[in-house]
From Swiss-Prot:
Keywords: Chloroplast, Magnesium, Manganese, Metal-binding, Mitochondrion, NADP, Oxidoreductase, Plastid, Stress response, Transit peptide, Tricarboxylic acid cycle. Substrate binds at T149, S166, P167, N168, G169, T170, I171, R172, R181, R204. The lineage of its organism: Eukaryota, Viridiplantae, Streptophyta, Embryophyta, Tracheophyta. This is Isocitrate dehydrogenase [NADP], chloroplastic/mitochondrial. NADP(+) binds at T147, I148, T149, R154, K331, G381, T382, V383, T384, R385, H386, N399.
Amino acid sequence: MLNKLTHGVFTYRASLTAMLSSSTSAGLSSSFVSSRFLSSGIFSSGASRNRVTFPVQFHRASAVRCFASSGGSDRIQVQNPIVEMDGDEMTRVIWSMIKEKLILPYLDLDIKYFDLGILNRDATDDKVTVESAEAALKYNVAIKCATITPDEGRVKEFGLKSMWRSPNGTIRNILDGTVFREPIMCSNIPRLVPGWEKPICIGRHAFGDQYRATDTVIKGPGKLKMVFVPEDGNAPVELDVYDFKGPGVALAMYNVDESIRAFAESSMAMALTKKWPLYLSTKNTILKKYDGRFKDIFQEVYEANWKQKFEEHSIWYEHRLIDDMVAYAVKSEGGYVWACKNYDGDVQSDLLAQGFGSLGLMTSVLLSADGKTLESEAAHGTVTRHFRLHQKGQETSTNSIASIFAWTRGLEHRAKLDKNEKLMDFVKKLESSCVNTVETGKMTKDLALLIHGPKVSRDLFLNTEEFIDAVASKLKTQFKELPLV
């Protein structure tokens, strides 16, 4: 079945079962990954905990054309590839289930597979992350499973060679895009802000500011200065910052016009796609030059490239002070795109997630400045606590909705780029199947807790696989004309 193996890339045509087998660590079968962690010994205690030996070449990338064993003609044809980025822990387990039960039975799909599991990132010195992002730029659509960002504890747990950077940060830097988060609305899930009748899509400028700042502890009295030394040989620019009378702290941060402009372009592209108004929030009344630069560049980009397009769809762009925007957000009904600076977006996106109900009901997409390349993923992490239960063979009730929507939002972008109406119809059916499943009372424990309170009984929620099966059943009723594998 293996036709070609060159520099860590292999291509083969496979049945549905073979495809699922290819999408797991070390060439292991999907059943091994989803149900044999406990018995395999891979996750046993000891110095080699969570270490597994595997041939690295099988993890760098694979190009897989997937179709049903009965033939691809009865599946929806997807003309161009998508990049799949596999992940870690409980989300990796449900990722395999989603592919097996909700995606592959319906789509004839060319998948460029990259294993971003922590073990493979370690084995490839994190090159696999860079390669996956470069593939995303090439094929314009990437769908990512949640991944571990290692801290000191994780380095020890997995025996890692290094404390590797966040895969999301690496991918963001290469794609040079903006992260947009948006809630998934279910009518029976209570919202902490009941007035939010429509989604709010929040865009975070994930570059610079506090996240690339230089900070220091000042140990005693003295003058703090900031100096800029031009490369053209002109005289340095020296600014007095503060005359310390005693100990304190200091911070220097920056941003660049190129990144701010890309942020503006991708924010406006998202707003136009959704046909929603766009708001940028800053504190330019205090940071007149720093935040003022954001305000000025957004206005320039809007006037030059977007104003006419926005007006044709009766939408608009507006700058607001961050405090005014937060107040507006709480009292609004939703239905707009909110462009935030880096720190504001970090904070406000979690506020929106809880306000709408749950991080488990939040999508996350990274959109490039030109609007052409999109990477989608769940907004939550790898659900470690549930994975520990899964390792012990105990029942879990893990919410897979955000991971399912990671697939649908990526496939939706593929459908738009390819003008593939059948694929777009599939996306709508799968998303509605998820929402309808919850709205008919079938849900995981985290959502049942929101409805029924902390003493929710076992009969009011489904376990991890039962929920995915319930969604699959809903989807099946919408595709009765298509035989299932």
